[in-house]
Amino acid sequence: MKRSFIFAPGMLALSISAISNAHAYNNLYVFGDSLSDGGNNGRYTVDGINGTESKLYNDFIAQQLGIELVNSKKGGTNYAAGGATAVADLNNKHNTQDQVMGYLASHSNRADHNGMYVHWIGGNDVDAALRNPADAQKIITESAMAASSQVHALLNAGAGLVIVPTVPDVGMTPKIMEFVLSKGGATSKDLAKIHAVVNGYPTIDKDTRLQVIHGVFKQIGSDVSGGDAKKAEETTKQLIDGYNELSSNASKLVDNYNQLEDMALSQENGNIVRVDVNALLHEVIANPLRYGFLNTIGYACAQGVNAGSCRSKDTGFDASKPFLFADDFHPTPEAHHIVSQYTVSVLNAPYRVMLLTNANNVPVKGALASLDGRLQQLRNVDNEQGKLGVFGGYSGNHSHTLTLGSDYQIMDNILLGGMISRYQDNSSPADNFHYDGRGYVFTAYGLWRYYDKGWISGDLHYLDMKYEDITRGIVLNDWLRKENASTSGHQWGGRITAGWDIPLTSAVTTSPIIQYAWDKSYVKGYRESGNNSTAMHFGEQRYDSQVGTLGWRLDTNFGYFNPYAEVRFNHQFGDKRYQIRSAINSTQTSFVSESQKQDTHWREYTIGMNAVITKDWGAFASISRNDGDVQNHTYSFSLGVNASF
């Protein structure tokens, strides 16, 4: 506004310090006004003249993507221009209608499916509406509709994802106060003096900020009154009323524009990442110290100097404290940085939340590890018909699964059983992401021996899972904000495994293994509490897994202590990726994120031992290592004891 104011995380191998590369976004395209202009008409922030010292929000986003953002005049993909509006009627030289249509025309009306787009416009349209009260609503409506139409044009042309920030509140900028003062007769010299006074005050919250503004108006009223107290009071009231009216009108127009655009954006499907910069601005002004700012009503550049030509070494530049504003309308580099952090946090949030899909599988694997130890033990003993067995097991790595089970030998060669497993985990699988997992796995299983050497085992299992205290951290300059939620999930599936024991010696056998496992996982969608700009909601997650396994094992029967070893080669036939739909809480739009392609081939090595303590008491233990499966911990172990009656 020239005239106006990031993939698989943790177990999914996503680097959350940058924008996820689960979808290979390899370029960034930007359309907008001076908030986004990388040099077409200027760079509107402190020390932004040559673009080497200060970065805009979109430069930071490009950096997270691993690319350099270059303005379109130099052949790059940043088409934004200072002073641009959404419609040509308000600025026929610089507008996003021409920016978007020109871009599409030069690319055969095809957008980049692997490209990330930013469309941020509206501040100058609001400014035009303020200057034309009679046509204000018409201007706001037409501009908001035009902006949303341009976004849909990009999506319809194949754009992979479009970031659409809300217009920040013009009514909260220093320009409003200076406009009221100028209208009241203040000269440039007067404004420079007032600017110095305003800059001297720390504005620690919104009330303090308003007190500073009222204090300035009161002092002016006193200065022009000539000692007449009544005149001073009247002048002060006129200035305060004028400021309140103009600021309120500007804020209402901004809210109206943002609401209209959001409604229009939501009318069609599309991958739209809405980021509420307007709400973020209000949050910063309400508590600036939290975000590293000391003044939100003054600005760093000298009075009358546009941010596009402002240098920190210039005479009149105020480096005494961190300011929110560079000039009377444009943000400082620090403010741009916080916008980029916020935007990247929204983009990366789904990849953190998708960790829960894989987390669903952890208690199931833990329970089945204990079951496998029990079944291995049963295959190596002569279990008489009518024998009742009970066992308890523990498995884990970074989590804990306790199992209690019982089985019954209904025939000489057929055994049936059931077990219940309790899972507990306090997990932080990625930076600034934590959850407490609690769940129960219910399993029914059976073992059939045939022709003395052949065996088939099968199981059916169901997981009931609760995720409490899901905490997502968002770093905003010096402040770590946390969003909280809870949800639930379940998983059900089954396995069938077969082998044939081949004697090598009287105490050693070997066996090929074939297994098919199927699981269906579900995590309920949830909404983070609160109405912060960063609070989001996430859709349900579903994932089908079908794994075929070939392997070989070696078993011993030495008596009291019987070691065994096994190697398995696994192939995933089910879903290779999973998706989630997400959005900030304050929008009607949403976007879909897709995980990285999951490993389709991996190996699993297991060594273990079962022990015969007495005739009716035994124990078992094993340790397994996954190789090539980043979705699961590299090592896990299981141990248990059993008794028979």
From Swiss-Prot:
Keywords: Hydrolase, Lipid degradation, Lipid metabolism, Secreted, Signal
Documented EC number(s): 3.1.1.3
One annotated Gene Ontology cellular component of this protein: outer membrane
Principal localisation: secreted
Localisation per UniProt entry: Secreted
Family annotation (InterPro entries): Autotransporte_beta, Autotransporte_beta_dom_sf, GDSL, Lipase_autotranspt_EstA, Lipase_GDSL_AS, OM_autotransptr_brl_dom, SGNH_hydro_sf
Stretch forming the signal peptide: 1-24
Domain of life of the source: Bacteria
Positions annotated as active site in the UniProt record: S34 (nucleophile), D327, H330
Catalytic activity from the UniProt record: a triacylglycerol + H2O = a diacylglycerol + a fatty acid + H(+)
Residue intervals of the Autotransporter domain: 383-645
Annotated GO MF terms: triacylglycerol lipase activity
Transmembrane parts of this sequence: none
PANTHER family reported for this sequence: GDSL LIPASE_ACYLHYDROLASE, PUTATIVE (AFU_ORTHOLOGUE AFUA_2G00510)-RELATED, ZINC FINGER FYVE DOMAIN CONTAINING PROTEIN
Name of protein: Lipase 1
Gene assigned in the entry: lip-1
